[in-house]
Amino acid sequence: MDLNQLLKGVKGVVAETAQFIRTERIQFSHEAAQVKGLNDLVSYVDKTSEEKLVQGLLQLLPESGFLAEEGTQAGLKEWNWIIDPLDGTTNFVHGIPCYAISVGLEHKGEIVLGVVHEVARDEQFCAIKNGGAYLNEKAIRVGATKRLQDSLIATGFPVNNFDQMQGVLNALEHFMRHTHGIRRIGAAAADLCYLACGRVDAFYEYNLKPWDVAAGALIAKEAGAIVTDFNGGAGWLHGRTIMASNPTLFEVFSAVIQTSFTNLS
């Protein structure tokens, strides 16, 4: 499999879908959004974007399977696309310009290709395993911040699982007191890419799904970040927790997360 050649095709499919989303946002109204679950919105834009992505990706890799947020299930195979057609739907619905397309390719349990396109800013992040990370064709690296007190931290809040709310509050209090600040962007894929290019220095969140992190985590890793689950292991893709930072900060940053959150399986 020539991943470099495949990446070129994926970037094109994602860019075309991003243009569709930008066009639809101009005429989009709140009434077009539907409630998928507690605090969880979906729209025809999510669904149509997923259809466009699936169609384009199947043309590139006909033998692939799919795991996608809006329900596309083509049976898991040796090569599987993990897709969020519109990460940050609530931002999109409310006109907040931070939402992204996330496409990761999994091979035998490992993410080997990732593309995240932040639609409103028209920024496309990408990576392949052992190939570095890029933003609009330029190589990117994580920041070099050495001290927690000089760092900017990104996180997300739970929308339908509040079992670890005390952990959320514990971590927030610590980082509010001991960093430059906390940013809650509202799209995990964008958070991870912001880490990859040095806009933030660390990211953590719990209760995530594979399509939230598949592409962004690979991009962050290829940009030099350390990425683990909350236990410090490799279960971030399916384990529903993720923490990531530049290597210099990781020891102290991860200690805060592990002290704040308890009773994690």
Residue map of PLM features:
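N-terminal subdomain of lithium-sensitive/metallo-dependent phosphomonoesterases centered on the IMPase/IPPase/PAP
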Residues: M1-L86, I226, A234, T248, ...
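Solvent-exposed alpha-helices and their adjacent loops that cap or buttress functional pockets
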Residues: Q34, A74-G75, K108, C126, ...
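Residue-level signal for inorganic ion chemistry
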Residues: I21, D46, L57, T89, ...
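An extended, acidic
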Residues: R141-S265
